[in-house]
Amino acid sequence: MTQTNDKLVIAGREFDSRLMVGTGKYADFQQMVRAIEVSGAQIITVAVRRVNISDRSKESLLDHIDLKKYTLLPNTAGCYTAEDAIRTCRLAREAGLSDFVKLEVLGDEKTLYPNNEELLKAAKVLLAEGFTVLPYTSDDPIICKKLEDMGCAAVMPLGAPIGSGLGIRNPYNIQIILESVKVPVIVDAGVGTASDAAIAMELGCHGVLMNTAIAGAKDPVAMAEAMNCAVRAGRLAYLAGRIPRKLYASASSPLAGLIG
């Protein structure tokens, strides 16, 4: 399979890019737009709290995003209870943003780890109301399986804490998740540089979502391009199939015909 016909499919929707990007922390809207463009991303996540739903006459980041070109993924960043997350998703739908949502229910302000108990409660309600739910969760295979069984369209385990840039801290859990569920697995949070994104894709993840790694870089536009390349390279390497790891050397050249 080549990358030309290798699509990311979420809830029946097809995407050419496996990189999803956020919209926060940029110096200005112009920098954000340029970074999104060179990233090649087709799915853009937006914190509902950052969108002025009550007064759309005021400038908003949505004024700078071509909604014909990109799929909007409203998220519930900043929510610490199921009730708050549910309310936020309903507001996004009522405002005409989307019912395709990234569900976040955080546990505390220091780690920004997900509160899985509240996450499961929120997911159950939102799925019953017809939302397409992509939950940000811990790298716990059991929780990911529960979310899939409930009807979530994908699972989004963290690679490391949000904004930490620590990379994929527990690749073995990610591998178990990949073996345990059939829905797309998208690493969300913790990516710091291009090699982290490539590793996630080489593991077999279906996509990577990031914000700080790009927006917080010294040159966000250049980093966005690097992430574009890394995700594509990692996916192609996964499809190609890496050689087995061995303890001892294996000569590249045949021993037959040696001189002398």
From Swiss-Prot:
The active site is at residue 102. One of its GO terms (biological process) is thiamine diphosphate biosynthetic process. GO terms for cellular component: cytoplasm. It is found in: Cytoplasm. Keywords: Cytoplasm, Schiff base, Thiamine biosynthesis, Transferase. It comes from the Bacteria. Pathway: Cofactor biosynthesis; thiamine diphosphate biosynthesis. 1-deoxy-D-xylulose 5-phosphate binds at residues 163, 189-190, 211-212. Its EC number is 2.8.1.10. It is an enzyme of class 2 (transferase). It catalyses: [ThiS sulfur-carrier protein]-C-terminal-Gly-aminoethanethioate + 2-iminoacetate + 1-deoxy-D-xylulose 5-phosphate = [ThiS sulfur-carrier protein]-C-terminal Gly-Gly + 2-[(2R,5Z)-2-carboxy-4-methylthiazol-5(2H)-ylidene]ethyl phosphate + 2 H2O + H(+). One of its GO terms (molecular function) is thiazole synthase activity. Homotetramer. Forms heterodimers with either ThiH or ThiS. HAMAP family: ThiG. Catalyzes the rearrangement of 1-deoxy-D-xylulose 5-phosphate (DXP) to produce the thiazole phosphate moiety of thiamine. Sulfur is provided by the thiocarboxylate moiety of the carrier protein ThiS. In vitro, sulfur can be provided by H(2)S. Belongs to the ThiG family. This is Thiazole synthase. It comes from Citrifermentans bemidjiense (strain ATCC BAA-1014 / DSM 16622 / JCM 12645 / Bem) (Geobacter bemidjiensis). The lineage of its organism: Bacteria, Pseudomonadati, Thermodesulfobacteriota, Desulfuromonadia, Geobacterales.
